[in-house]
């Protein structure tokens, strides 16, 4: 789903560079993406992390001399129509290049990742005197506990100006985990996917003084059908094009054997089936190897695999109304209607690409990725 609009035609973008300790270095306003960036792209995600790249002219941009590895790039957006400015993206520069183009313009190019990638740099170690790092509680609080253990307790591993939000119990799912030398980011994603009732995100504070890891019942606004202010994509609302409703029937999986831990006769096997689908479309069985998963969670794993691989249906479409930053942002939950079908989605990711090089009118392409939450057909 891609929306192409004139870059910042009615609003503005603002870029700010900070030092690794969040000290101010430089900023740049631009109304048409041509004053500083010859190119700029960034991806912002919820429950993960995006990336960014950008290039500026060395001779004219106030940002050029500060484009160093480990500095922080913050992108502000003021949407059209007088809406308030907000932080659309914050990331950490990981690589820089300085070069001369074929047209003899000297540029500085930066590449980096969204701030959420901080959690991708840690492993969960056993607690002192224990075989594992074991936690039990609400899923979102367990996640924050692991982040505190790895990112805050050891002064040699602490990231400057980083903290974890308080435990507020955004999740309603209680679970236990025994972790030993596992990737922190992977554990966080696994817990989040198992619970599927909270979001996580690392954001930069409004005063730019620090990054914060937090969990949310909904990171963005809930604008699904039935909410106080629903956002519905439909042909009647003229904000949808090329809708496609599809159904997959007989070739879907109706029964899944989840192979858990153990060997031989001692191996745990859990069967999950869709009896209604078997009656309609016939029996279709497969196995799924997940020996690393705890036995109590094998059923939920099977339900997830069955949902993904089983008889199913979907509604795909393209958004044609811009309104990014006004009607919707990353993390928002929205709905769609077509052919008597209703569907709910989470906007998992937004990709923004501003290309001004050799263009009289710079173009901003905005591409949201939607995750289907529920289909009612």
Residue ranges and their predicted role:
Residues 37-40, 157-158, 331:
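Short structured motifs
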Residues 41-61, 105-118, 191, 258, ...:
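Oligomerization/assembly interface segments of phage tail-like spikes and tubes
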Residues 44, 97-100, 202-206, 354:
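Short, low-complexity Ser/Thr-rich regulatory SLiMs
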